[in-house]
């Protein structure tokens, strides 16, 4: 009897394990993130969806930025692929976590949205799914590459704004404000000198006709007195 009971328990255990493994093998990504090529300034979306093969305690999706193009190995820009993660692997050492979504159920999806993408956003992104069953955690991941092309118009505008504006005298634009007041002051000083000159001339005394008449009269009296003196001397 004891042997039959042990056989029965073993059969039930392996049956449950087989069913669980069969259901777990049905867990899959229903939507893989795709490689995206965008131009600077555009809005970018990456979609990721996962379906569990059994009743899960919870499902969780995390979006990660793994590394930029300078850190990638040759051929790392290939199509997204599903890869199992090791349980003892430290995910924080793999990149930067961007967002997390957690639900109770068998299906989960999450879109990564990047508005006004820039060149520094280029690189490898990863969708990580944690499937929490009773007594165990299963992790899955899928990757996609974001390629960002430079916006030539934006680059030209940045270069134009960064370069100094040169004038005809080969001085930077920032010196224009200093040059203008000096020229204004110089012209103002010239106007001051030109307007002050008549004032200096006006201070020089001028002889009026009356003063000239007085001078002529005094000379005439002197001559008359001199003549009278000569006549008086002759008569004596």
Swiss-Prot record:
SUPFAM superfamilies on file: Immunoglobulin (SSF48726)
GO biological process, one term: positive regulation of lipid storage
Residues spanning the signal sequence: 1-24
Record-annotated disulphide pairs: 48-127
Positions bearing carbohydrate: 35, 175
Gene Ontology CC: extracellular region; membrane
PTM characteristics: N-glycosylated. N-linked glycosylation is critical for secretion but not for preadipocyte cell differentiation activity.
GO MF terms, alphabetically ordered: identical protein binding
Annotated Ig-like V-type domain residues: 27-143
InterPro entries: Ig-like_dom, Ig-like_dom_sf, Ig-like_fold, Ig_sub, Ig_V-set, IgSF_V-set/TM_domain
Keywords, in A-Z order: Differentiation, Disulfide bond, Glycoprotein, Immunoglobulin domain, Secreted, Signal
Classification via Pfam families: V-set
Transmembrane segments: none
Disordered: annotated segments: 184-206
Alphabetical list of PROSITE patterns matching this protein: IG_LIKE
Cellular localization per UniProt: Secreted
Record's compositionally biased regions (Polar residues): 184-199
Function of the molecule: Plays a role in the regulation of the early stage of white and brown preadipocyte cell differentiation. Promotes adipogenic commitment of preadipocytes by increasing gene expression of the transcription factor PPARG in a BMP4-dependent signaling pathway.
Quaternary state and interactors: Homodimer.
Protein's recorded name: V-set and transmembrane domain-containing protein 2A
Source organism (scientific name): Homo sapiens (Human)
Higher taxonomy: Eukaryota, Metazoa, Chordata, Craniata, Vertebrata
